[in-house]
């Protein structure tokens, strides 16, 4: 598959397919023409010795300092070197790859003044899978993701570290190996590379993809739990959900009915009890609300993926050219969205932990043994798996605190309000990793509970899931190191996302 970039129409589904199929990037001719036109404006500014921020002046507090024309290119290299102050563990290779795609896409809008050489260098790095090593910490989320994107830019000019064919190498060595020259930054290009929200947005895209997948995975896991507890299926009837109007809730209820169709373990209202606890009865309402959040996040991310968030921006209208210093680099819209994503995923984990508690609690699990122990007393069974899940959801409650309500001044109070969007992105992904493990714990426990109930009673669809995951997690016949089971399921759930055939 080839992903065609035009600066206007990139979607998250495009990114997902690109990652699944190890695709290449091609650029639409019209987009290249826009790049040429915006670059011509920069060249005219230089020729006419105009005063324009970041082209003929310094940056931030130094915006009033005029730069000698012989030092315009040096200014851009100095910018990249000085701003590469990222700290901590690097972003994943998927996030770094998406970051390059998003930065390339915004340059193709033709408002940044980049050269074709810069555009082609980004395309080369993407297609050859030369992945810049980009530390996660150090961004305030306005003026964009300066520190992370500076590390990306370092790789392009042959000064940074990269991951290439599974090995960490100097960018310059990889370029030499591939007979490719480092990029020679021209006026405006350093700024064009780092003034933007691509770090938070790239992490947000990966987080959205994995969060949405977790939402779907949580449904069949919940269906296993539901059957193991002889849950009441009436609560999922279409007429119940249609009168509330939330389409996502209606959709979850329909999928739950589909997962449970043909089960002999489900019950009807008043057959065993009149109604179930909320964690079973309200799955469509709770999970559906998370999908509402995911849909909002997707919309915001796709707006930003196709946005011009550089500064200054170059415009041409009716044969008139003008360059405007604005603030499209400010990450507030994405920061809000990613804080919402944290809430949506946290709730999937919260309700999962409460469901698995019902499976192991002898006061709540019907006729199942306490903690599903094969020999209660001598063997503890799933007792501490519930502890682990409780620990993860409690950690999520701390991580879910909104990063976007925080701000701190920088650059001598010139940049006096920031979004903290990249912090929201980082914390959000940790919540996703935690939630995936909570769902993995529910899966391990629900598999055992279903076995004790009798797998012949499972619906055909959940029976297939049972068989699929029993190949990863064997029956619990005695106490063992359950962390291995949990991690095996969590990794299997994650790996399925980037395969062309999804697991759910």
Swiss-Prot record:
* Post-translational modification summary for this protein: Contains an active site 4-methylidene-imidazol-5-one (MIO), which is formed autocatalytically by cyclization and dehydration of residues Ala-Ser-Gly.
The protein's annotated pathway: Amino-acid degradation; L-histidine degradation into L-glutamate; N-formimidoyl-L-glutamate from L-histidine: step 1/3
Q: What is its EC number?
A: 4.3.1.3
Per its UniProt record, what Pfam families does this chain match? Lyase_aromatic
GO cellular component terms attached to this protein's record: cytoplasm
**Might you name a Gene Ontology BP term for this protein?**
L-histidine catabolic process to glutamate and formate
Its annotated compartments are:
Cytoplasm
5-imidazolinone (Ala-Gly) cross-link, renumbered residues: 142-144
- Which positions form S-S bridges? none
Q: Which GO terms describe its molecular function?
A: histidine ammonia-lyase activity
Top-level enzyme category: lyase
Transmembrane segments annotated in the record for this chain = none
Q: Which residues carry this modification: 2,3-didehydroalanine (Ser)?
A: 143
Family per record? Belongs to the PAL/histidase family.
HAMAP family referenced in this protein's UniProt entry, alphabetically: His_ammonia_lyase (MF_00229)
Return the protein name: Histidine ammonia-lyase
| Gene of this entry | hutH
């Amino acid at each position: 598959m080839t992903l065609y970039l035009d600066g206007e129409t990139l979607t998250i589904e495009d990114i997902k397919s690109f990652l699944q199929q190890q695709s290449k990037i091609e650029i639409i001719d019209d987009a290249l023409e826009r790049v040429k036109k915006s670059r011509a404006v920069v060249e005219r500014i230089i020729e006419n010795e105009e005063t324009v921020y970041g082209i003929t002046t310094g940056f931030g507090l130094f915006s009033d300092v005029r730069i000698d024309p012989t030092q315009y290119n040096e200014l851009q290299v100095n910018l990249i070197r000085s701003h590469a102050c990222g700290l901590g563990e690097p972003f994943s290779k998927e996030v770094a790859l998406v970051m390059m795609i998003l930065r390339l896409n915004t340059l193709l809008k033709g408002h940044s003044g980049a050269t074709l050489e810069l555009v082609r260098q980004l395309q080369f790095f993407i297609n050859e899978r030369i992945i810049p090593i980009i530390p996660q910490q150090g961004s305030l989320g306005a003026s964009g993701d300066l520190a992370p994107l500076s590390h990306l830019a370092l790789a392009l000019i042959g000064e940074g570290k990269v991951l290439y064919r599974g090995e960490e190498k100097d960018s310059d060595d990889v370029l030499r190996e591939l007979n490719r020259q480092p990029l020679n930054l021209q006026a405006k290009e350093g700024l064009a590379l780092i003034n933007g929200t691509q770090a938070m947005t790239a992490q947000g895209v990966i987080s959205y993809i994995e969060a949405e997948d977790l939402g779907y995975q949580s449904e069949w896991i919940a269906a296993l739990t539901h059957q193991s507890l002889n849950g009441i299926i009436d609560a999922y009837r279409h007429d119940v959900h249609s009168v509330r109007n939330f389409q996502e809730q209606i959709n979850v209820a329909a999928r739950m009915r589909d997962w449970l169709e043909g089960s002999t373990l489900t019950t009807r209202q008043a057959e065993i009890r009149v109604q179930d606890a909320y964690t079973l009865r309200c799955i469509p309402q709770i999970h559906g609300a998370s999908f509402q959040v995911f849909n909002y996040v997707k919309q915001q991310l796709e707006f930003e993926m196709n946005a011009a968030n550089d500064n200054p921006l170059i415009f041409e209208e009716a044969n008139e050219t003008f360059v405007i210093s604005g603030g499209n680099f400010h990450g507030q819209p994405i920061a809000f969205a990613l804080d919402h994503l944290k809430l949506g995923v946290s709730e999937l984990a919260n309700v999962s932990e409460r469901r698995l508690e019902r499976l192991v609690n002898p006061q709540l699990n019907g006729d199942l043994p306490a903690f599903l122990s094969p020999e209660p007393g001598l063997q503890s069974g799933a007792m501490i798996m519930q502890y682990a899940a409780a620990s993860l959801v409690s950690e999520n409650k701390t991580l879910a605190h909104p990063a976007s309500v925080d701000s701190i001044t920088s650059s001598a109070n010139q940049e006096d309000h920031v979004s903290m969007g990249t912090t929201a992105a980082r914390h959000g992904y940790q919540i996703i990793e935690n939630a995936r493990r909570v769902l993995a714990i529910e899966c391990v426990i629900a598999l055992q509970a279903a076995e004790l109930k009798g797998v012949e009673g499972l619906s055909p669809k959940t029976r297939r899931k049972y068989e699929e995951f029993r190949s990863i997690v064997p029956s619990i016949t005695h106490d063992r190191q359950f962390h291995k089971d949990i991690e095996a399921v969590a990794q299997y759930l994650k790996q399925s996302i980037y395969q062309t055939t999804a697991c759910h």
